[in-house]
Amino acid sequence: MTIAIGKSEQKRGWFDLLDDWLRRDRFVFVGWSGLLLLPCAYFALGGFLTGITFVSSWYTHGLASSFLEGCNFLTAAVSTPPNSMGHSLLFLWGPEAQGDFTRWCQLGGLWTFVALHGAFGLIGFMLRQFEIARSVKIRPYNAIAFSAPIAVFVSVFLIYPLGQSGWFFAPSFGVAAIFRFILFFQGFHNWTLNPFHMMGVAGVLGAALLCAIHGATVENTLFEDGDGANTFRAFNPTQAEETYSMVTANRFWSQIFGVAFSNKRWLHFFMLFVPVTGLWMSALGVVGLALNLRAYDFVSQEIRAAEDPEFETFYTKNILLNEGIRAWMAAQDQPHEKLVFPEEVLPRGNAL
């Protein structure tokens, strides 16, 4: 009689087989997150390239916006749908386009296509970082950090227009189109004086400063200079081993500033914290603008400036500039309103 000791092999189902295939070690990792990331990224990029190459914005903005119409890579864009479409998702098979691809493009359907697939593609990329971090057994701080640009994208391209009258007021996907949106934000929301924008700027520029300082410091202490040191020694090292020293770096910055990071974990957490928090705060500010919340309005200065021609501050000057942006921009930017301003109400500078 034969006695078998041990557990019988469990029958593997389709889920286990799919899990094995998705998470197999290959040149480009797919994973479960890839089921969301790869198709969404493909469609978002494909829709964007199709839009800037072939699709006009004549029916939505009264503009030329494609290479086919003579735009270059700075002025081409995938434009938002017209204001009359409201917050329609503009499905190709929906009541607006009714399955007609040409009409769908004319109505701005590519914008919602790119925006929604782009948002899910970014989320898929964050999930990819979670998944690979779990596989190689490291902490998921990369994914947490990547949530910051996702928050900015979702707040600017989705939440803000949802708070306004339609997708029309979101940024179009293009370089010059984004610049137009920035001017719009300043003129209509006084965005640069918003404390959340200030925190965002402090976070991004502070992160750039920290990155430059950190890179230079590590490069400075990575190799030990001998008598033959010169400016380009760091790029042509002759040492067998690196000589990086946190203690030396700490001594250097203690002498420069009087303070320095005491350990690597605190230093690198701070480099993570500054830009991520700045972007999160900026995204929160844009959500506020979606609800048309105002930030700093120094009404007392505006009243005094209106009463006293000799009283002016940089704030009151900026308020006048914002009024100029609105007056000059609105008629061109919102053709559906059919705005006509009499010549005498349009502000003109000395050069005009």
Curated annotation (Swiss-Prot):
Lipid bilayer topology: Multi-pass membrane protein
Membrane-spanning residues: 40-60, 124-140, 152-165, 207-227, 278-294
One Pfam family here: Photo_RC
Binding site for pheophytin a: 129, 142
Modified residues (Phosphothreonine): 2
Modification N-acetylthreonine occurs at: 2
Keyword set, alphabetical order: Acetylation, Chlorophyll, Chloroplast, Chromophore, Electron transport, Iron, Magnesium, Membrane, Metal-binding, Oxidoreductase, Phosphoprotein, Photosynthesis, Photosystem II, Plastid, Thylakoid, Transmembrane, Transmembrane helix, Transport
Main location: plastid
Family designation: Belongs to the reaction center PufL/M/PsbA/D family.
Quaternary organization: PSII is composed of 1 copy each of membrane proteins PsbA, PsbB, PsbC, PsbD, PsbE, PsbF, PsbH, PsbI, PsbJ, PsbK, PsbL, PsbM, PsbT, PsbX, PsbY, PsbZ, Psb30/Ycf12, at least 3 peripheral proteins of the oxygen-evolving complex and a large number of cofactors. It forms dimeric complexes.
Name of the molecule in the record: Photosystem II D2 protein
